[in-house]
Every structure is written in structure tokens, then in C-alpha cells.
């Protein structure tokens, strides 16, 4: 009962049809990659190492892409092969998700709860509250 209520609150907050509780952020990213049928995934150079681990566990090809001064992935450096981009909002700095509209986007909102429009322009949102 509590899980169903929690899922409804989170899905509404992030503008999504569904929400699911999983054990941790690494599992959430793994599941998101499987749901999106991702094959080639870009992630920023500056991010939690568990994001790369989730990519490797999911069997996708990770592309580690340079960040700009704002610590967000540099869209101009994303290789053509990439079909999915994982975007963490590092230190609560909101990334420009709209600029990634030609990719499937997994938005990591673990560090930015409370910012406007979270989940509005991404395919999947993940939130982790622990290590």
C-alpha cells in the first residue's frame, strides 16, 4: 500500500506514467537501460562510478564524454553511435535536457530534488538516496 502511494507521488512529480522502487541507483540505471533497449550510452566524465558499473552490467557500450565548465555532458562531443544519454544533475546544477532531444535520456535527479521541470523532457528518471 505504501509503495503504491509512493510510486504515484513520484510518478506525478516527475511527469511519468509509472514509478518503481528498486534497491539502489545502480539497479535503477540498469533497469532503465533494459527498458529503453539501449545499446550505446553516453555518460559524463564527472559522475558517480556506479553509473559506469550499471552500463557494464547491462551489456551496453559506454562512451565517457567530456563535461563543460558546468559539469554537464558536452552535447557536441557525443558520438554519433550513441542512442541513450545518462544525465546526472551534478551538485544540483540543472542540465539542459531539451538539448538532448535526439537521444533517449535517463535523468539522474539524485542531487536536484526541487528543481523545476524534472522529468519533463527525459524518458526515464532515477533517484537514489544512498550510496
Feature-to-residue mapping (PLM):
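Conserved N-terminal alpha-helix of the aminotransferase class I/II PLP-enzyme fold
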Residues: 1-27, 46
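Short, well-ordered alpha-helical microsegments
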Residues: 28-30, 49-52, 93-96, 113-114
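Conserved PLP-anchoring active-site segment centered on the Schiff-base-forming lysine
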Residues: 32-79
Amino acid at each position: 500500500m505504501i509503495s503504491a502511494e509512493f510510486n504515484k507521488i513520484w510518478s506525478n512529480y516527475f511527469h511519468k506514467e509509472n514509478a518503481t522502487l528498486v534497491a539502489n541507483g545502480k539497479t535503477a540505471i540498469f533497469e532503465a537501460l533494459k527498458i529503453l533497449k539501449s545499446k550505446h550510452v553516453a555518460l559524463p566524465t564527472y559522475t558517480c562510478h556506479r553509473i559506469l558499473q550499471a552500463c557494464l552490467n547491462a551489456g551496453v557500450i559506454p562512451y565517457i564524454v567530456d563535461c563543460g565548465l558546468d559539469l554537464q555532458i558536452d552535447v557536441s562531443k557525443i558520438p554519433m553511435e550513441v542512442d541513450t544519454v545518462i544525465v546526472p544533475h551534478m551538485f544540483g546544477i540543472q542540465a539542459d535536457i531539451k538539448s538532448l532531444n535526439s537521444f533517449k535520456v535517463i535523468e539522474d535527479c539524485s542531487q536536484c530534488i526541487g528543481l523545476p521541470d524534472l522529468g519533463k523532457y527525459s524518458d526515464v528518471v532515477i533517484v537514489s538516496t544512498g550510496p
